[in-house]
Structure formats: structure tokens, C-alpha cells
Amino acid sequence: NNFDDVILFNTNNNIIETTNSNLFILNYNKVITPPLKDGCVDGSMRKLLISIIKNKYEFEEESISENDLDTCSEVILSNSTYGVRGIKNINKKTYNNSNLYKYLINSLNNLI
């Protein structure tokens, strides 16, 4: 099926992360990532990205539903191995990954 990763859901049907990454979505000018109480990993890259995101975007930790993936404009995955990755598509939805993704890549490169 040519999948690179799988999205994981908790028992409440909320998205928590993928098999190896934290997940962030951009919905208008607001970045959302699942809260720790939903079951995601509290990784070091997640913490760093949250601090970077707050410099430019409105930010919330809130539950993400599968429907939210249909309305957001970007989906970003992160972990300490590769940093950030922009997702091109999930099911039939295509994402542009032009704003948040580029901002995070540039911000991380400036830290190096």
C-alpha cells in the first residue's frame, strides 16, 4: 500500500501520534498537538518544537480527531532522529506543508 507510517489512536478515537513520531497540525494560524493525557510521548523534540511554535503561531494541546485531518492545511511529524517531516497526504487529503514546515525547518537549522 506504499505507507511510510501509521497514525495511532487512543481508546477515545483521538489521534495520539504515529508509530515513531509526535504529530502537529496547522489549522488556520493555530498549531495543535495532542495533549499528554491522550497518550502521546513527551519527547525532547516535541518540547523544543512547542517552544519554537509559540514564537509565531497560536498553539494548543488538544485532542485531534480523524476529522481534524480533513480540515487542517498541514500535518507535521517530529522526533529526535530526523527532526521534522511534512506529510504529503493521508488517505485522499493532500497537504501543502509550506508555512509551518518551512518555519520549523528554518528555526531548527538556525539552532545548529
Regions inferred by a protein language model and the residue ranges of each:
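Conserved catalytic-core subdomain
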Residues: N12-I112
